[in-house]
Amino acid sequence: MGCKMKQTAFEKSIDPASQKMLEKAENEGIETAWDRYEKQLPQCSFGQLGICCRNCNMGPCRIDPFGEGAEKGICGATADIIVARNLLRMIAAGAAAHSDHARDAVLTFKKMTEGEAGSYGIKDKTKLFSLASEYGISLEGKSHEEVAGELASALLAEFGKQEGPIQYTRRAPEARLRLWTSLGIEPRGVDREIVECMHRTHIGVDNDATHILLHGLRTSLSDGWGGSMIATEIQDVLFGTPEPKKSTVNLGVLSHDKVNVIIHGHEPILSEMIVQAAEDPELLELAKEKGAAGINVAGICCTGNETLMRHGTPIAGNFLQQELAVVTGAVEAMIVDVQCIMPALGNLTGCYHTKFISTSPKADFPGTVRMEFHEERAYDTAREIVRTAVENFPNRNIEKVNIPEEKQECMVGFSAEAILKALGGSPAPLIDAIAGGAVKGIGAVVGCNNVKVQHNYGHVNLVKELIKNNVLVVTTGCNAIACAEAGLLVPEAAAQAGDGLKGVCEALGIPPVLHMGSCVDISRILVLASAIAKSLGVDISDLPAAGAAPEWMSEKAVSIGAYVVSSGVFTVLGTVPPVLGSQAVTALLTKGLDNVIGASFAVEPDPFKAANLMLEHIEGKRKALGLN
């Protein structure tokens, strides 16, 4: 096997700001994720194929993919069983991450209603009452706090339910609900499905690949229509439902003369308070005393998306830019909560003056300053954290500072409510545009970054190809940040769209790519798709719509992909999931699910070919609806 040549900065990322910081890191002898990836090569083939099992201590067992060695594990598990079990455990972990996020949001909401979290309040009373009505909670003669208390109890009950249904699944079209029920995959309770995943994958329990994967779909639905949707909705009540606004993105948002505070992770419970604390007059005065012109908060990953959507707080970058933000030498504090935070940040921040501050009771990292965050004294803790950053400003080493000039304007804040409002209150104008052919369909492009592929290349080129062919794109997470950095989240980007989509965007004053939020906010896409399907009297699987995750890497993305497909949306993955060790599992995911759930996966690393797969699917659905 030949040696892999060391990648250049250009080969690692298409983003100019990232390329500059990668070169700076190399010149300074700083290790990044790309360096660690190269040291891992060649990666374990058994792991890549999904045919390694270590679920009991008789193993680990490996299946020979060429049929020349072991065909079964010690217990008799075949490649099909092992691959399916491993995939189910990935779905369980992803669903748990989203759903635990939701649980914390609801618990904060509950504490607020009980007067134990005074830093928080109700920002969207309209949504509060709407959600309460969905749960059959009477509003008559009750205060906002009383209604909120009953809603908090109802939402918490979704996690521990044993028989279901999860209330938000009622938002799906009737045809989809009937299908889930007939297949036995309607989720019963958020926690129950995740626990059952772990039970089923214990030695000697579920050993039929199809049966295992059907429970994977059920568990993912408890995420998409349960945990993630609960998180989105209750965060809107607490912090406000996003509306369109402008902001800026990329590493160039960092300031030369202000205290730079990075918020990184996924839970806005913390980041909302950090944004407020950064405007505290006492802390701003302290910043001046320390020689700074002010306090600049910028986001990384989804907690950044949350504050971007609601406050216009700038975004410094997506997942693979977290290290590069520190490499600028200009970050006083990297404040983290949970999910997608590299433990490598501990060593990295030690090379600069940056304080690496961990805050979550359930997540700590090497090399952190521990400042545990609790809702009961949320704002006070946030002030202490920001104060730590401000007091660190004089320690900045000017000789190490190099902030790329690249930053890009963007328009964000397209919640489902904001989109419907822009359309005049109903999806009818969008449906008319689709029926008339000006808009061919909708593409939902989401997901992570992955060092196995060039940073942002898949995200940006796939989306450009879709809008060029008159597909309106909705986006969340790290894809949204990639598109923003590429200038696709401004109305002027309509110039890159096909004539039909361009005309629609110009008429509405919107970009051809709509930023709908963080990863849990993919639930907003489900709500929008359901609204369109119900207006047409069809199932989601009948819509001219397709999904993609060009650079996915996390277990959360596996759960997302599963619930999107289970909801009826054909989805293209840009990096290969660990399933190729089983022909049966691969065939079920890429073909067989069409006959079961009305949608399936495809795997295509080339973003242009992936776009063609999505366009072909959209055209097929248009034809079936008689729209061609």
Curated annotation (Swiss-Prot):
Keyword Iron appears in the UniProt entry: yes
Q: What are the entry keywords?
A: 4Fe-4S, Iron, Iron-sulfur, Metal-binding, Nickel, Oxidoreductase
The cofactor named in the record is: [4Fe-4S] cluster; [Ni-4Fe-5S] cluster
What Gene Ontology molecular function terms does this protein carry? 4 iron, 4 sulfur cluster binding; anaerobic carbon-monoxide dehydrogenase activity; hydroxylamine reductase activity; nickel cation binding; peroxidase activity
Q: Where does the chain bind [4Fe-4S] cluster 2?
A: C53, C56, C61, C75
Which reactions appear under catalytic activity for this entry?
Answer: CO + 2 oxidized [2Fe-2S]-[ferredoxin] + H2O = 2 reduced [2Fe-2S]-[ferredoxin] + CO2 + 2 H(+)
Q: What CDD domains does the record point to?
A: CODH
Matching InterPro entries: CO_DH_a-bundle, CODH, HCP/CODH, Prismane-like_a/b-sand, Prismane-like_sf
Q: What is its EC number?
A: 1.2.7.4
Please give the family membership noted in the entry.
Belongs to the Ni-containing carbon monoxide dehydrogenase family.
Q: What is this protein called?
A: Carbon monoxide dehydrogenase 1
Q: Which species expresses this protein natively?
A: Methanosarcina mazei (strain ATCC BAA-159 / DSM 3647 / Goe1 / Go1 / JCM 11833 / OCM 88)
